[in-house]
């Protein structure tokens, strides 16, 4: 058989590729072309390569492209099997005068024909050809060679068919196909557009695995696409807007890509566009905001104008979509606009190194306020049947981001919406699994560092915590939250989240959002302790909360890197103990003693005596563990000292316990070893408050303080109340 005959036989693959979607019954195909059956029989009975080649040629001539239906293709496979194509793909001995790639082309053509059957496309004999098929994409050769072009087309046909099977993307990635596709695209040889299309499909199906296996090659493609995007002057720039989000890496985006992408977006969004042109650009900008925050936007006047333009366009789109009741909402576009609004909120509240100037911030806050009003209007229309929809979740998210920074504006509208928000958060909390699914669906459009994750089933509540923390300070909103049952929900939520930090759980893998959420819950409870003490006394959920705080603090204060959470727990527990002092759980039980011992440890270890060069006397200084977090901690520390002071007369066993811990003695010793000038007046007042209450509550405490030169120390620091107390018998 001649080389030309082999090439002709290779057209069988073409026929398979061009096969019509309609599949006539086999008996109809037979009656229309009875010769085909004889040739298929010859193919099955072929005894050597030459006979198989001849039979394939006869089959090819006997049928037209549209005549090969799925059943016929399957019968050809039954006659040929995989052994023959395998030999064609791997042979290194071609007939004289026949280029070896022609044999491989025939082998690939046969596979392409077989792969049009989904069952065969997932066959192990096809899957194990993935590595060799991938090499054909980057093989060098004459670009005008028809056989080579045919082989490239057939190769893409095979790989695309495999990608369409359930586990196909995983096999392609493992077989090196992603790198081969990247190289084929970057080489811009024949079929490079097919390489890009298949890459897009693989990234959409298995983004993480693709980047893990071929990050350098994918970054090279991103660089090429970004450069093309920056230079594009025709409609291709809008097509690239749709492609580029898929090629943004899960890690750092190269700076040169960011420059090109920002420049291209600035040119697009600065022009007058129709919605089909503008929307992909907004979605690309949202993905960049998600991946990089505002780092992709250059500093200076051009960058600030671009950011202001982004947020303006996003707010206009949100208002147009949500203000008109009954208007069809393009949820993917509006959710992308939410991400850009969140970027605007972050930049407007940033004090240092903000891209925006103050007049721009004022203007954007006003514009965003109107868009948030539209979001509230939309949420007011949401019925129970829509509460599990991802777009509702995204709308609550952007509202939560706004309320975390601004609660004074739109106060009436926010108060009217609070009952819905409490019910919505409760619904998702109680159906944690569904809430987790929702969070994963919208996570890619979030841009804050507290992106929802699988360890946080109560997403909606977490998103609302910062805003509720502000609102519980105000009488009106606080009354609504209490009436709707928010405190009870928050207690349950806190206890559930606390389980994630308990022994037996690996806290090193917890997202920061868990601890931040716990701290924010503590702040809300602190607000309620101060503004609604009656609620703490009468609601049983706070008794359960107190028990959890008492059980948890002893181990928490021993853990490295969790001092801020320990401060919140200690201070909240001390303040609640004053209100619940008559509770049996606080009457010197092991749990209560353990809690107060841990609270004393937290309060007593904040400061140390530190020697200073050239001075005979040490100064009072923060201990190393407290230095880095004191700015966030000091208010809690002073509040904790005040709360402990208030607990001493209410709990008779507390003063003897404090004496056994040697805190009063060590405190006086510390004050006696440092220069009084180094102790700030507010510190003196805090220390005196504790010492005075301990001295008043217990005679043994007074005696121990006198033995520690308490009267002299009180005189040095002008602690008149302590000096007077120690002078009493």
Curated annotation (Swiss-Prot):
Signal peptide: none
InterPro entries: ARM-type_fold (IPR016024), Neurochondrin (IPR008709)
Modified residues (Asymmetric dimethylarginine): 75
Post-translational modification: Palmitoylated. Palmitoylation by ZDHHC1, ZDHHC3 and ZDHHC11 regulates the association of NCDN with endosome membranes. May also be palmitoylated by ZDHHC7.
Subcellular location: Cytoplasm, Cytosol; Endosome membrane; Cell projection, Dendrite; Postsynapse
Subunit-level organization: Interacts with MCHR1. Interacts with SEMA4C. Interacts with DIAPH1 (via FH3 domain). Interacts with GRM5.
Record family assignment: Belongs to the neurochondrin family.
UniProt function note: Probably involved in signal transduction, in the nervous system, via increasing cell surface localization of GRM5 and positively regulating its signaling. Required for the spatial learning process. Acts as a negative regulator of Ca(2+)-calmodulin-dependent protein kinase 2 (CaMK2) phosphorylation. May play a role in modulating melanin-concentrating hormone-mediated functions via its interaction with MCHR1 that interferes with G protein-coupled signal transduction. May be involved in bone metabolism. May also be involved in neurite outgrowth.
Annotated protein name in UniProt: Neurochondrin
Source species: Bos taurus (Bovine)
Name of the gene: NCDN
């Amino acid at each position: 058989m001649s080389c030309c005959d082999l090439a002709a036989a290779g057209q069988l693959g073409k026929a398979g590729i061009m096969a019509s979607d309609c599949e006539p019954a086999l008996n109809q195909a037979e009656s229309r072309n009875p010769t085909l059956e004889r040739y298929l029989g010859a193919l099955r009975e072929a005894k050597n390569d030459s006979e198989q080649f001849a039979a394939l040629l006869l089959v090819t001539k006997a049928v037209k492209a549209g005549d090969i239906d799925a059943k016929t293709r399957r019968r050809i496979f039954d006659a040929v099997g995989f052994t023959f194509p395998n030999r064609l793909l791997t042979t290194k001995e071609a007939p004289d005068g026949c280029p070896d790639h022609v044999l491989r082309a025939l082998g690939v053509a046969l596979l392409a024909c077989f792969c049009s059957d989904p069952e065969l496309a997932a066959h192990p004999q096809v899957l194990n050809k993935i590595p060799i098929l991938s090499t054909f994409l980057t093989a060098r050769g004459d670009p005008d060679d028809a056989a080579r072009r045919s082989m490239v087309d057939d190769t893409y046909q095979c790989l695309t068919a495999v990608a369409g099977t359930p586990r196909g993307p995983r096999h392609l990635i493992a077989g090196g196909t992603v790198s081969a596709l990247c190289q084929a695209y970057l080489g811009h040889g024949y079929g490079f557009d097919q390489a890009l299309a298949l890459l897009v499909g693989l990234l959409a199906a298995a983004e993480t695995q693709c980047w893990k296996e071929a990050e350098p090659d994918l970054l090279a493609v991103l660089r090429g696409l970004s450069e093309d995007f920056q230079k594009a002057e025709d409609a291709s720039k809008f097509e690239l807007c749709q492609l580029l989000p898929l090629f943004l890496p899960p890690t750092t985006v190269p700076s040169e890509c960011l420059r090109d992408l920002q420049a291209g977006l600035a040119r697009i969004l600065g022009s007058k566009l129709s919605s089909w042109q503008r929307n992909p650009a907004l979605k690309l900008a949202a993905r960049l905001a998600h991946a990089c925050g505002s780092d992709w936007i250059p500093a200076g006047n051009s960058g600030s104008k671009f950011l202001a333009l982004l947020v303006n366009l996003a707010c206009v789109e949100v208002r147009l979509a949500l203000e008109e009741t009954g208007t069809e909402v393009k949820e993917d576009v509006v959710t992308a606009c939410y991400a850009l609004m969140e970027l605007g909120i972050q930049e407007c509240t940033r004090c240092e190194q903000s891209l925006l100037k103050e007049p721009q911030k004022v203007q954007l806050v006003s514009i965003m306020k109107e868009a948030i009003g539209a979001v509230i209007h939309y949420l007011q229309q949401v019925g129970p049947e829509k509460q599990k929809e991802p777009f509702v979740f995204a709308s609550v998210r952007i509202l939560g981001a706004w309320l975390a920074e601004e609660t004074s504006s739109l106060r009436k509208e926010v108060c009217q919406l609070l009952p819905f928000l409490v019910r919505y958060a409760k619904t998702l909390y109680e159906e944690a699994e569904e809430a987790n699914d929702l969070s994963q669906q919208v996570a890619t459009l979030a841009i804050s560092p507290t992106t929802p994750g699988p360890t946080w089933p109560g997403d909606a509540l977490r998103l609302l915590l910062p805003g509720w923390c502000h609102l519980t300070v105000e009488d009106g909103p606080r009354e609504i939250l209490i009436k709707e049952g928010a405190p009870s929900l928050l207690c349950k939520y806190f206890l559930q989240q606390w389980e994630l930090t308990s022994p037996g759980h690996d806290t090193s893998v917890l997202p920061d959002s868990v601890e931040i959420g716990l701290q924010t819950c503590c702040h809300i409870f602190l607000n309620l302790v101060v503004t609604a003490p009656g609620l703490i006394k009468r609601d049983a959920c706070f008794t359960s909360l107190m028990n959890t705080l008492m059980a948890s603090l002893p181990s928490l204060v021993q853990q490295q890197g969790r001092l801020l959470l320990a401060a919140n727990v200690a201070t909240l527990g001390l303040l609640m103990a004053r209100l619940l002092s008559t509770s049996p759980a606080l009457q010197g039980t092991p749990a209560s003693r353990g809690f107060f011992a841990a609270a004393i440890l937290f309060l007593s270890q904040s400061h140390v005596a530190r020697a200073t060069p050239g001075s005979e006397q040490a100064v009072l200084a923060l201990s190393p563990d407290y230095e880095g977090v004191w700015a966030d901690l000091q208010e809690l520390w002073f509040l904790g000292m005040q709360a402990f002071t208030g607990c001493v007369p209410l709990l008779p066993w507390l003063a003897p316990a404090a004496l056994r811990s040697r805190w009063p003695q060590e405190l006086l010793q510390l004050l006696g070893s440092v220069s009084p000038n180094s102790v700030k007046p507010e510190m003196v007042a805090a220390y005196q408050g504790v010492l005075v209450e301990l001295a008043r509550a217990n005679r043994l405490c007074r005696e121990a303080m006198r033995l520690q030169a308490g009267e002299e120390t009180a005189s040095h620091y002008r602690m008149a109340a302590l000096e007077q107390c120690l002078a009493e018998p």
